[in-house]
Amino acid sequence: MPSDRQRKIRNFSIIAHIDHGKSTLADRLIERTGLISQREMQAQVLDNMELERERGITIKLQSIRLIYKAKDGQDYYLNLIDTPGHVDFTYEVSRSLAACEGAILVVDAAQGIEAQTMANVYLALEQNLEIIPVINKIDLPSARPDEIKREIEDIIGLDASEAPLISAKDGLNIDDVLEAIVKNIPPPTEDEEAPLKALVFDSYYDNYKGVVAYTRVVEGTVKKGMKIRMMATKKEFEVTEVGVYSPGPIQLDQLSAGDVGYIAASIKDVRYCRVGDTITDALNPTEHSLPGYRKVTPMVYCGVYPAEGEKYEDVRDALDRLQVNDAALVFEAETSAALGFGFRCGFLGLLHMEIIQERLEREFNLDLVTTAPSVIYRVTKTNGEVVMIQNPANLPVTQEISVIEEPIVKATIMVPSEYAGIVIELCQDRRGEMKGMDYIEETRVNLHYELPLNEVIYDFFDALKSKTKGYGSLDYEMKGYKPSTLVKLDILINSEQVDALSFIVHESKAYARGKGMCEKLKDEIPRHQFPVPLQASIGTKIIARETIRALRKDVLAKCYGGDISRKKKLLEKQKKGKKRMRQVGSVEVPQKAFMSVLKLDT
């Protein structure tokens, strides 16, 4: 049974597809409960990274406590945990849902249910959460709330008859949402007297307090001065501060079962406070840790190098700092003949990779070069040994390879039916295999495909959006590995291989990719005093070539008329000089050339 204190607590998060109005609804709830006055209000209050506001997306989950006076005259504590919507950040969503009893499902009144909405709903159902559907953007002329209600009931199977119809932008019917939270989301019921058990669902590094952990107290109580133990690492610390965010940090005496807040304990090393860990009382520990999060596996790898070699340690420090609150980022040191010392980093997807790169550049003032993104391939060698390859440079020679397998994803693509043909064409072009197709209603269709992850990570999402005028939506999950005819494509500049530009590609696309890279490099590398050949090769076979023409001095400028043999002699002399220069000269590849080639459309 919930205690009197717990009866007043509601822990919930907001889930939705990108752009369905999740952060705007969070802003309105904050405003309506009087937490921030309209004067201090700024759009996307919970998106406190500059990058999040700029891109209009939520990247990191945030938590905040609201106090709401309900119609029954009681004050309720509502702990809102904001979640991202992009497919790359599904792990952030699963983390925040683990700390809640309920979720608000925001659906756009014009767009309806999309692929990512479905994926997040399934995550919430797995955690046995109470889901409240809310239909947003009813102020739009194209809004069709009644149809959307039917869609929610038919596709997800949730009763949407009492779903609040709101406009988060205009602040319409926001009270209905708050009342629905109080009425429908169950209060926490855990035991306050049991030994402490708290779930770390996020953390960040503070220069003064050390690592600060966002936690949901599941059982027991945590107070200042108490000795706590991290169950995964067995490390012990003394709590220096506990409190809640409302919206800034507010210190409290204690956090008890059902509360969502933060704990600071002068933890200096980010590795000791892992997201998904359980915090317990060091003197009276709980027997079992909470069921941890599944460890997230990176899907995409790329090399990250400092533009100036001496900044190597700074990059390591920055990656360490980012890793504390981004459980999905993994990295290890590597070296490249072309770029020097750097790191091989693993990400969840291309958006995640871009975000990390931008955060490194902005928050830590680093100048970086990144190599082409690649996925993990499984290679069976002729001697039966199986190796996982994440860096194309480590691929064994062709003679040693028996089979190369590439990762395959199970993709669900939702599109308006008039775009189905274009999307099927796109999937076929990306070597997709159709597994099924069903109509949700007359106007929308659900396509089920198996696609190579290599084809999805580059620009599949962008291509899908542009071909469906923004209406297509995608959700995917790993399925496994499948044998494929893949080759390693090397780029040679002035007959020297540049390891940072090597990548693994399907045989059918090797020529187009190789030719595209040579053409792009030709535009980007400045001309030298000698001709520079640019070649794309598979093993020893050259499949594409471009030549950067030499800069030439006009050696005939001072020959006015005169004997032809004199001119020939001067030209011959110049030719010999160029030949000698080509043998000893080295070609500088500017950083801009690396960047533009790696952004090459695939």
Swiss-Prot record:
Molecular function in Gene Ontology: GTP binding; GTPase activity; ribosome binding; translation elongation factor activity
Reactions accelerated catalytically: GTP + H2O = GDP + phosphate + H(+)
Domain tr-type G: 7-189
GO biological process, one term: positive regulation of translation
Keyword GTP-binding tagged: yes
This protein's GO CC annotations: plasma membrane
EC number(s) recorded for this UniProt protein: 3.6.5.n1
Membrane topology: Peripheral membrane protein
Residues where GTP binds: D19, H20, G21, K22, S23, T24, N136, K137, I138, D139
Subcellular location: Cell membrane
InterPro entries, alphabetized: EF-4 (IPR006297), EFG_III/V (IPR035647), EFG_V-like (IPR000640), EFTu-like_2 (IPR004161), G_TR_CS (IPR031157), LepA_C_sf (IPR038363), LepA_CTD (IPR013842), LepA_IV (IPR035654)
SUPFAM superfamilies assigned to the protein according to its UniProt record, in alphabetical order: EF-G C-terminal domain-like, P-loop containing nucleoside triphosphate hydrolases, Translation proteins
Swiss-Prot/TrEMBL keywords: Cell membrane, GTP-binding, Hydrolase, Membrane, Nucleotide-binding, Protein biosynthesis
Matches recorded under Pfam families: EFG_C, GTP_EFTU, GTP_EFTU_D2, LepA_C
Family: Belongs to the TRAFAC class translation factor GTPase superfamily. Classic translation factor GTPase family. LepA subfamily.
PANTHER family per the UniProt record, alphabetical: TRANSLATION FACTOR GUF1 HOMOLOG, CHLOROPLASTIC, TRANSLATION FACTOR GUF1-RELATED
Function noted in UniProt: Required for accurate and efficient protein synthesis under certain stress conditions. May act as a fidelity factor of the translation reaction, by catalyzing a one-codon backward translocation of tRNAs on improperly translocated ribosomes. Back-translocation proceeds from a post-translocation (POST) complex to a pre-translocation (PRE) complex, thus giving elongation factor G a second chance to translocate the tRNAs correctly. Binds to ribosomes in a GTP-dependent manner.
Name of the featured protein: Elongation factor 4
Gene name in the database record: lepA
